[in-house]
């Protein structure tokens, strides 16, 4: 039986590719997609979900827009990474269908209520919508199998020296998720910076030769440029969000540890930092499965294999 999932995302190039991967995978049943503000404004990320589902010919999947700002802060966006549209690069279709009239939280709650089995929530943007769901529907916690997030880092940040972007945007929401008691799987920068797509990989995807693999290559062409900056020390571009879906499909290509994670919400220098108790110093029981490494070639091969689904 396919694993039921809800995807909460803020497309964004890597989020768009995560959608492509999820919808090419019969092991997963995508029951709903909700949009969060982060990589771009809430209007643009919602539009980008609809554009991607139009491209992938999946207007049957319910879509709803989420919170317009973080729980307690003003919104920060990453337009310097993802461009004016949030998906700059390829020519994507205009949406062929409309989102649901309700909110992301309402769609998530309805999906959980109606599911015969617990649902995995995959959250690849800031955690605002998921935190709102957890706070407003405690009766539905048992319907959530796990929450798989792209966010955080044991080591270095990518938005501040200490903080990864998604967590920095809404640290209060992330703290709610980590302390919810629901199993959390964290794909942070420790693993996503190892899930780099090289120039040769982009050409491999392009050579698959179907319309979707071509679009993915064009998304990566744009995304690649930002990551050429020498400060990162990258060979390629890190594919953050797809690590969440790849872990659901092939956990064996990832190395993980079980640790307690908390989120710093007030630090002068460390606001938005995910504090990972690697050496069990706090006495707190582990609340997260933390990805620390990935078989990069296995990750690339999985993407290439699933892109052939769209032939």
UniProtKB/Swiss-Prot annotation:
EC number in record: 3.2.-.-
In the record, biological process GO terms are:
nucleobase-containing small molecule interconversion; purine nucleoside catabolic process; pyrimidine nucleobase metabolic process
Any one GO CC term of the record: cytosol
Which residues are in coiled coils?
none
To which protein family does this belong?
Belongs to the IUNH family. RihA subfamily.
NCBIfam families associated with the record? PRK10443.1
What does it do? Hydrolyzes cytidine or uridine to ribose and cytosine or uracil, respectively.
Entries under HAMAP family matching the protein: Pyrim_hydro_RihA
The identity of this protein, by name, is Pyrimidine-specific ribonucleoside hydrolase RihA
Organism lineage reads as: Bacteria, Pseudomonadati, Pseudomonadota, Gammaproteobacteria, Enterobacterales
């Amino acid at each position: 039986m396919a694993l039921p999932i809800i995807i909460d995302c803020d497309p964004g190039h890597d989020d768009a590719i995560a959608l492509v991967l999820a919808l090419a995978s019969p092991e997963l049943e995508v029951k709903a997609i909700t949009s969060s503000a982060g990589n771009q404004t809430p209007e643009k990320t919602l539009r980008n979900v609809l554009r991607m589902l139009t491209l992938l010919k999946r207007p049957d999947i319910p879509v709803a827009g989420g919170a317009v700002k973080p729980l307690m802060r003003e919104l920060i966006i990453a337009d310097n990474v993802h461009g004016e549209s949030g998906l700059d690069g390829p020519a994507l279709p205009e949406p062929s269908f409309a989102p649901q009239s309700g909110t992301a939280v309402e769609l998530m709650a309805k999906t959980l209520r109606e599911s015969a089995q617990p649902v995995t929530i995959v959250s690849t943007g800031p955690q605002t919508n998921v935190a709102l769901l957890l706070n407003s529907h405690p009766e539905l916690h048992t319907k959530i199998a796990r929450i798989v997030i792209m966010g955080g880092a044991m080591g270095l940040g990518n938005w501040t020296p200490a903080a990864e972007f998604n967590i920095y945007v809404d640290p209060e929401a992330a703290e709610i998720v980590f302390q919810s008691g629901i199993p959390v799987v964290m794909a942070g920068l420790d693993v996503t910076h190892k899930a780099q797509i090289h120039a040769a990989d982009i050409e491999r995807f392009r050579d698959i030769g179907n319309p979707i693999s071509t679009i993915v290559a064009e998304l990566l062409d744009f995304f690649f440029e930002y990551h050429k900056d020498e400060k990162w020390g990258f060979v390629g571009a890190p594919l953050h969000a797809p690590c969440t879906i790849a872990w659901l499909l092939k956990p064996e290509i990832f190395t993980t540890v079980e640790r307690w994670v908390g989120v710093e919400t007030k630090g002068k220098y460390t606001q938005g930092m995910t504090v990972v108790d690697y050496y069990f110093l706090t006495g707190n029981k582990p609340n997260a499965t933390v990805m620390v490494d990935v078989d990069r070639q296995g990750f690339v091969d999985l993407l290439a294999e699933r892109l052939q689904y769209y032939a």
